[in-house]
Amino acid sequence: MGKVWSKSSLVGWPQVIDRMRRQQDPAEGVGAVSQDLANRGAITIRNTKENNQALAWLEEQKEEAVGFPVCPQVPLRPMTYKEAFDLSFFLREKGGLEGLVWSTKRQEILDLWVYHTQGIFPDWQNYTPGPGVRYPLTFGWCFKLVPLSPEEVEEANQGDNNVLLHPMCQHGMEDPDKEVLVWRFDSSLARVHRARELHPEFYQNC
């Protein structure tokens, strides 16, 4: 039996076992491609740019100038609870996201940056529907989207320095409920999966 597995057969095994130990399940709430990456180690033919919105969107980004390379610098992987948790606290510490007005383009830039630097497939940043507070579907991501009151929007729009195309000046045009949303950090989201409590139907196939 010892002849079958010689010393030469063990080349690379330390790296393999290290990868196995570091393997984590995807965070609850990630998309179908991330589930593929976690369960099968690759994107399968079940998910294509024809039937998966995230894949189609990512393909489009490769053809546009977004300010930094789109291809990931590290192996492609799904968002895990720990990754989402660590990213949340990293962004909170560095600043910039807290209180920033949400827009589709800004969310896409964040998704692409995480994809490029960490190799995390961009189907993890999704939120519960409105109106009202939108909670992250991915457990571990501690930023929710909070609507501003009409008074807060008007106050922010006062002055001569406002840019007409700034998300604040769009009065929620991108949001189905016409609300101006901002990212807000909420550490309780690391302990309580509010999205699953409010919308268990979103997790039936997870």
Curated annotation (Swiss-Prot):
Ranges for region Binding to ATP6V1H: 148-180
Region feature Mediates dimerization, Nef-PTE1 interaction, mapped onto this chain: 108-124
Q: What are the protein's UniProt keywords?
A: AIDS, Apoptosis, Early protein, Host cell membrane, Host Golgi apparatus, Host membrane, Host-virus interaction, Inhibition of host adaptive immune response by virus, Inhibition of host autophagy by virus, Inhibition of host MHC class I molecule presentation by virus, Inhibition of host MHC class II molecule presentation by virus, Lipoprotein, Membrane, Myristate, Phosphoprotein, Secreted, SH3-binding, Viral immunoevasion, Virion, Virulence
Which InterPro entries does the entry link to? Answer: HIV-1_Nef_anchor_sf (IPR027480), HIV-1_Nef_core_sf (IPR027481), HIV_Nef (IPR001558)
Might play a role in AP-1 recruitment to the Nef-MHC-I complex (site feature) positions: 20
Q: How is it modified after translation?
A: The virion-associated Nef proteins are cleaved by the viral protease to release the soluble C-terminal core protein. Nef is probably cleaved concomitantly with viral structural proteins on maturation of virus particles.
Per the entry, what induces it? Expressed early in the viral replication cycle.
Name the species this protein comes from: Simian immunodeficiency virus (isolate EK505)
Q: Where is this region: Acidic?
A: 62-66
**What domain of life does the UniProt record list for this protein's source?**
Viruses
Q: Indicate how the chain sits in the lipid bilayer.
A: Lipid-anchor
Task: Kindly list the places in or outside the cell where this protein is found, as annotated in its UniProt entry.
Answer: Host cell membrane; Virion; Secreted; Host Golgi apparatus membrane
Q: What is its main location?
A: host cell
Q: Which Pfam families match?
A: F-protein
What high-level taxonomic lineage is stated for the organism? Viruses, Riboviria, Pararnavirae, Artverviricota, Revtraviricetes
Give the encoding gene's name: nef
> Where, by residue number, is the motif PxxP?
72-75
What is noted besides the main data? HIV-1 lineages are divided in three main groups, M (for Major), O (for Outlier), and N (for New, or Non-M, Non-O). The vast majority of strains found worldwide belong to the group M. Group O seems to be endemic to and largely confined to Cameroon and neighboring countries in West Central Africa, where these viruses represent a small minority of HIV-1 strains. The group N is represented by a limited number of isolates from Cameroonian persons. The group M is further subdivided in 9 clades or subtypes (A to D, F to H, J and K).
| Name of the protein in its database record | Protein Nef
GO BP annotations of the record are: symbiont-mediated suppression of host antigen processing and presentation of peptide antigen via MHC class I; symbiont-mediated suppression of host antigen processing and presentation of peptide antigen via MHC class II; symbiont-mediated suppression of host autophagy
Q: Which family does it belong to?
A: Belongs to the lentivirus primate group Nef protein family.
